[in-house]
Amino acid sequence: MNNENNFSVFSGTNSRYLAEKICNSLGCPLGRMNIEHFADGEFAVSYEESIRGRDVFLVQSTFPSSDNLMELLLMIDAAKRASAHYITAVIPYFGWARQDRKDKPRVSIGAKLIADLLSKAGITRLITMDLHADQIQGFFDVPVDHLYGSTVFMEYIRKNMPLENLVVATPDVGGTKRANSYAKHLGVPMVICHKSRLKANEIAEMRIIGDVQDKDVLLVDDIVDTAGTITKAADLMKENGARSVCAIASHAVMSDPASMRVDQSTLKEMIFTDSIPYPHKCEKVKILSVADLFAEAIKRVCSHESITTLYYF
């Protein structure tokens, strides 16, 4: 793709590798930008080329720390002050998405706050993938293009996992809709893990609803953080007679001790996308790229085409 659509792609520190792959897919260079860090921990953003009147796409996942969010906000502000025409935030992993509602008294709703900050900074569109809660799209007053990791996962599953003995499973009731979509499109049964938590990242009890005896189980989730839920679900599947257990999840948050838990679990394979950089070496982890998916979304936004056909479900 040539650059006749008058657009430029830039990247924050956290997502540079993915942004480079997106640009390779688009056939355009990654835009030149400088992020200067100071001794006191502050940083400043400046564009090293003119973006006046251009449509800019700023690629940055807001994980693993608030610095990445602040960096993105400064990128947006600098683009607005440099007279960019349209400013699209491309956020492969939208951090704080698990703070999407008031589930107890006197608690913040982080996802809404982040949406307000991005909008106030000056974005005119958001492209993201597999939000933890679909309703977060409604927190924005600008268009939101919500992509799905299933677009790349389904191709991998069909090529590498025999469907005749496959069962799709969700590690918690909240993921039932997602797992049901996979089961429906693959034409296979679904089972559910029901869990109760003592507190965040700490599971009290888990049980299976459904039959996995002598089946190859595919656990489906959106985020793996400490990997406590996904590995406990895998172990439970094996205890209940599953022949093998693999898992897919869009976002590899993988906070310690997640990698160790995955390696020591009964999981045969753990498959993520590259929405978040995953630098650790874990023999069971496989990474699928979503660069082509985001590149196609950017291309269609620039040419005012529908992106609905990019959705697998």
Curated annotation (Swiss-Prot):
SMART domains: Pribosyltran_N. NCBIfam families: PRK01259.1, ribP_PPkin. Coiled coil: none annotated. Mg(2+) 2 binds at residue 172. GO terms for cellular component: cytoplasm; ribose phosphate diphosphokinase complex. This is Ribose-phosphate pyrophosphokinase. ATP binds at residues 40-42, 98-99. GO terms for molecular function: ATP binding; kinase activity; magnesium ion binding; ribose phosphate diphosphokinase activity. InterPro entries: PRib_PP_synth_CS, Pribosyltran_N, PRibTrfase_dom, PRTase-like, Rib-P_diPkinase, Rib-P_diPkinase_bac. GO terms for biological process: 5-phosphoribose 1-diphosphate biosynthetic process; purine nucleotide biosynthetic process; ribonucleoside monophosphate biosynthetic process. It is an enzyme of class 2 (transferase). Keywords: ATP-binding, Cytoplasm, Kinase, Magnesium, Metal-binding, Nucleotide biosynthesis, Nucleotide-binding, Transferase. It comes from Porphyromonas gingivalis (strain ATCC BAA-308 / W83). It comes from the Bacteria. Belongs to the ribose-phosphate pyrophosphokinase family. Class I subfamily. Its cofactor is Mg(2+).
